[in-house]
């Protein structure tokens, strides 16, 4: 995919900021959801001015660039829920968008495999759920049919989802940004938002008074003035909300997922995505086999508490991030309910042999000599004060002048990458209704 045409402006370009510091809407966060939302808004309202403010020097650096790359079909989610609707819509929009833009993807399918008899009723219930969600081409298949698709996979029965695919979501995110810029939007990187408040006076270059009454400052003291703000801050959504005087709830607790990778000479053993039957007692899906666009195969991930919000390595540590997490009562309530599974995840994170044992339930031929440690990602898990994982989308604003001009996307849970274009349409509608665009 051609991505060299994307032009971003760093906040250190003071000439740009002096000449172009006022916008109708500023979107905080240059990940998939922020970029898709900004793109949707500028396409709907080409006469208005929009900016994306991203704290990193590049776009899609964190969750958007550290995910599994799966285009989910919408099987897992409660029928009628927002997640289910947005995933099914989003998958179709994602494929259509990739076709239009020439972004490579592979519709390699997914098998959800029951390896024990007790998992079969749950697998059948998952099939019924998928049908209710209108997932395309879903079917239950026998062990023989499963092995025709995945010759090295073992199991009693599988749920076959041929509509599931894979893509490089960073390419998708950069394409959103390119669309946004071509439509007149501005992308400001290296702009870490540290303050939002009502402006006491108009910007120096303005001849329109306080038409843009909200001032957004970054860590360097540079300013952008706008009428409205949409925040899609991912791992920092709670802190960005607090900056504007809005509620810190729900809190973000970071969970790191470590992947293993199959050695290149062993990748022939996996053709499509292979997933376990989810256990309703545990909050995450469990280890799985994920082919990648570059031909590699990722295994995992686990799910362990990260000691830093952008902590991609085992010993990455931030006193503030760690303190915020361990002092939050909601985390301790979550831990107390999932102590055994949490300890198992920590054990598997430290010992490859424990992860391999889980993988061998599906592909017995995989050995510890076939794998290497791979990349990691950090998931922004929203958690309420009772220790419940917030499983759906959360939007809020605040009170007073500034709160009425801000829409915070507090939680955009997995599969937000798959659903990003559908989420963007929902956010754009919310912005139009709240702010009267």
Region roles according to the model:
Residues 19-33, 51:
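Beta1/beta-strand and adjacent pyrophosphate-binding region of the FAD-binding site
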Residues 36, 196-318:
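Flavin-dependent oxidoreductases
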Residues 60-90, 100-105, 306-343:
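Glycine-rich active-site loop/strand segments that organize a redox cofactor
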Residues 69-149, 155, 286-287, 296, ...:
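Dinucleotide-binding Rossmann-like beta1-alpha1 core, especially the glycine-rich loop
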Residues 79-89, 113-122, 160-181, 188, ...:
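Short beta-strand to alpha-helix junction loop
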Residues 159-228, 232-233, 239, 421, ...:
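Helical element adjacent to the flavin cofactor pocket in flavoenzyme catalytic cores
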Residues 329, 334-437:
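C-terminal catalytic lobe of FAD-dependent flavoproteins
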């Amino acid at each position: 995919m051609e991505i060299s045409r994307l032009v971003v402006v760093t906040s250190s370009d003071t000439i740009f900021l002096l000449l172009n510091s006022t916008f109708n809407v500023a979107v905080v966060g240059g990940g998939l959801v922020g970029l898709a939302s900004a793109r949707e808004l500028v396409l709907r309202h080409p006469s208005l001015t929009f900016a994306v403010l991203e704290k990193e020097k590049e776009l899609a650096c964190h969750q958007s660039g550290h995910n599994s790359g799966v285009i989910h079909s919408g099987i897992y989610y409660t029928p009628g829920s927002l997640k289910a609707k947005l995933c099914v819509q989003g998958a179709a929009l994602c494929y259509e968008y990739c076709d239009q833009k020439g972004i490579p993807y592979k519709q390699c399918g997914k098998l959800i495999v029951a390896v024990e008899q007790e998992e079969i009723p749950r697998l059948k219930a998952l099939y019924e759920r998928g049908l209710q969600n209108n997932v395309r081409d879903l079917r239950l298949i026998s062990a023989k049919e499963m092995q025709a698709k995945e010759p090295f996979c073992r199991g009693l029965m599988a749920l076959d989802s041929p509509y599931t695919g894979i893509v490089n979501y960073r390419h998708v995110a950069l394409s959103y940004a390119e669309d946004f810029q071509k439509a007149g939007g501005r992308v400001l990187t290296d702009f870490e938002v540290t303050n939002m408040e009502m402006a006491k006076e108009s910007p120096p270059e303005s001849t329109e008074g306080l038409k843009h009454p909200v001032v957004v400052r970054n860590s360097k003291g540079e300013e952008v003035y706008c009428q409205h703000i949409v925040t899609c801050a991912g791992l920092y959504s709670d802190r960005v909300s607090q900056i504007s005087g809005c509620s810190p709830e729900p809190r973000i607790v970071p969970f790191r997922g470590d992947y293993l990778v199959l050695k290149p000479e062993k990748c022939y053993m996996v053709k499509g995505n292979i997933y376990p039957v989810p256990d309703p007692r545990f909050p995450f899906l469990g280890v799985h086999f994920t082919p990648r666009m570059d031909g590699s195969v990722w295994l995992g991930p686990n799910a362990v508490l990260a000691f830093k919000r952008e902590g991609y390595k085992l010993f990455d540590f931030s006193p503030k991030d760690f303190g915020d997490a361990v002092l939050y009562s909601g985390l301790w309530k979550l831990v107390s309910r999932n102590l055994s599974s949490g300890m198992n995840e920590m054990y598997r994170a430290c010992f490859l042999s424990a992860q391999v044992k889980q993988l061998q339930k599906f592909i017995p031929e995989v050995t510890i000599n076939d794998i290497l440690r791979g990349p990691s990602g950090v998931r922004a898990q929203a958690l309420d004060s009772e220790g419940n994982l917030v499983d759906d989308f959360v939007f809020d604003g605040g009170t007073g002048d500034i709160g009425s001009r801000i829409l915070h996307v507090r939680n955009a849970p997995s599969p937000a990458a798959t659903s990003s274009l559908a989420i963007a349409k929902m956010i754009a509608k919310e912005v139009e209704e709240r702010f009267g665009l």
